[in-house]
Amino acid sequence: QHPANFKQVLAGQLPHLGLLVSGGNTLLFEISTAGVLKVLAETVDDAAGEALDKGAKLLGIAYPGGPQVEKLAQQGDPHTFDFPKAIAPRNERRFSFSGLKTSLRYRMEKMTDAELEAQLPNICASYQKAVIDQLLGKTKHILEVESYQSIGLSGGVSNNKALRAGVQRLAQRYKIRCMMAQAQHTGDNAAMIAFAAYADPTGTNTSEVNIAPSLRLDQFC
């Protein structure tokens, strides 16, 4: 679910660490015991979902690319190709995915059409692994230096099985609760908006904001 009326929804689970991954946003945020939201890390260029879609487009995979990359990745070996996982040091709190797309293009330029077709599942598996490894690596670093009661995964890319499994492993490792929407609901924005209303039946959790297509999460929470 998208964050709304945090103190009610996350009762007993604060402080909370959230990973939001979609085609337009990639960020880590925390919700304090007082219910205050703070962005800890965000992408400096492409969002993770955007990187998956752009990679799919380079490979000639039909839109929506991300789910198709995941489907092909399940048939491939994620260790076949070594794509860069980040340009930033592991402890630097930012994401970057633009270099990953460039690396894929250079890799493709060195392959024949026949090689590309034969290696497509392995390319998708390796490319997806690079995206997910960066997401989980940054999340793991924050869990190592901060203390949380719960971790959450949201956004359209939270439907990705490998990412969901990775977040669940982190929750188990750090002995905290894992919170994420059921996979079938991860792409339904209407359901997320309805849940926000359900979590705040009195309508007190409001904010005066203008329409902004790329509004930051911490600008309205």
What are these language model-derived features?
Residues 1-16, 196:
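Conserved phosphate-binding catalytic cores of ATP/NTP-utilizing and phosphoryl-transfer enzymes
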Residues 71-151, 160-174, 201-204, 218-221:
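A contiguous, well-structured pocket-lining segment that forms one wall/lid of small-molecule binding clefts
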Residues 18-20, 26-30:
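Short beta-strand scaffold segments in enzyme catalytic cores
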Residues 1-3, 181-219:
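Glycine-rich phosphate-binding/hydrolytic loop that grips phosphoryl groups
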Residues 22-24, 151-160:
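Glycine-rich beta-strand-to-loop/alpha-helix junction loops that act as flexible
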Residues 32-77, 101-102, 106-111:
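Glycine-rich phosphate-binding loop plus the immediately following alpha-helix
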Residues 150-151, 168-192:
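Conserved phosphate-binding/catalytic loops in two-lobed NTP-binding clefts
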